[in-house]
Amino acid sequence: ELRLSLREIRTALDAYKQAVEEGRVAHAAQDSGYPESLQVLVDGVPDASSPDRKKWIYFLRQVPRDPMFPDPSLPNEETWGKRSYASSHEAPEEGDDVFDVYSLAPGTGLNGIPYRKW
């Protein structure tokens, strides 16, 4: 389930970036083109290509929960680590956008890879 949740979020992040590149999502020139938060993927954004901007684009129905995260009391979005576009893969940090997500859960998968590295 972790792999599926990661794939769902990463696919939505890529779709958002693609919509920015196609001019369907308004953004500032200096922005990376990735959303400010995972919640933006659920809340949606106005379709800039729609003549009256009444059409919205949604990328997720809801933010999936990290199935390995130990605390069930936190909201789904807070169960993920978020990496900004400006941070490195080796040392992911939050920032002005969400470029990628990773598991915050301790532990290692059956494949020997820590959940954080999936």
Language model features with spans:
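Low-complexity, acidic interaction segments enriched in glycine
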Residues: D14-W118
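Aliphatic-rich helix starts adjacent to a transmembrane/signal segment
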Residues: E1-L6
